[in-house]
Amino acid sequence: MAHKKGASSSRNGRDSAAQRLGVKRYGGQVVKAGEILVRQRGTKFHPGVNVGRGGDDTLFAKTAGAVEFGIKRGRKTVSIVGSTTA
């Protein structure tokens, strides 16, 4: 019986925390300005009307309204419709 664990076993045992990516607000949901709609790496979803894109490609609502997912020119887009600009 070996009294040492072996070369690799003591070097294992690390993992990174999940990044919590994905869609945060779904189609038809009413949102306020500034709410995060999608967290993503790269532009899986592109910003549509009244939606901004952050430095890490996060999509956020620029105005209040309802979330709408669509396709434009073969790209998935996220827009805010029925917004009340006050």
From Swiss-Prot:
<comment type="similarity">
    <text>Belongs to the bacterial ribosomal protein bL27 family.</text>
</comment>
<dbReference type="GO" id="GO:0003735">
    <property type="term" value="F:structural constituent of ribosome"/>
</dbReference>
<dbReference type="Pfam" id="PF01016">
    <property type="entry name" value="Ribosomal_L27"/>
</dbReference>
<keyword id="KW-0689">Ribosomal protein</keyword>
<dbReference type="InterPro" id="IPR018261">
    <property type="entry name" value="Ribosomal_bL27_CS"/>
</dbReference>
<dbReference type="InterPro" id="IPR001684">
    <property type="entry name" value="Ribosomal_bL27"/>
</dbReference>
<dbReference type="GO" id="GO:0006412">
    <property type="term" value="P:translation"/>
</dbReference>
<feature type="region of interest" description="Disordered">
    <location>
        <begin position="1"/>
        <end position="21"/>
    </location>
</feature>
<keyword id="KW-0687">Ribonucleoprotein</keyword>
<protein>
    <recommendedName>
        <fullName>Large ribosomal subunit protein bL27</fullName>
    </recommendedName>
</protein>
<dbReference type="GO" id="GO:0022625">
    <property type="term" value="C:cytosolic large ribosomal subunit"/>
</dbReference>
